[in-house]
Swiss-Prot record:
GO terms for biological process: ribosomal small subunit assembly; translation. HAMAP family: RimP. Belongs to the RimP family. Required for maturation of 30S ribosomal subunits. Its main location: cytoplasm. It comes from Clostridium perfringens (strain SM101 / Type A). Keywords: Cytoplasm, Ribosome biogenesis. This is Ribosome maturation factor RimP. It is found in: Cytoplasm. PANTHER family: RIBOSOME MATURATION FACTOR RIMP.
Amino acid sequence: MKKEQLVADLEALCAPIVKEKGYDLYHIEYVKENNEYYLRLYIEKPEERISLRDCEIVSRALSDMLDIEDPIKDAYFLEVSSPGLNRRLHSDEHFNRFIGKEIFVGFKSSLSGRKNVKGILKDVQENEIIVECEGNEIKVPKDKIKTANLEGEI
């Protein structure tokens, strides 16, 4: 099974349980690091901070279900956490949600001589995002984005 399909299947299995426990699933990823596999789920609660106890509640519920369903054939570690203040932006839904906020975008390759941009997310369009940086609007094609993060406000 392809990784993208596995992640989609895992999201379909996990999202209802996360929701049942009173949280929203922000993002899910299945990665291999140093010869170990990790299933990482990032949860949130609108207008509330996520505590260690929140992560524990969701982790236990997911662990029980994943043991029964057994969707992952490899040995792996389950990690549940908050996306954090400087959360990664993965989808149009994430970008749209944070219009008007400060973001940092790293590029896959140079864009107008720049490797990245930090500024206010102004708009999200089908193939690009628009970031205002130092009074200029910079159009960033989505296929040029390597990473995008919200710049946290404390």
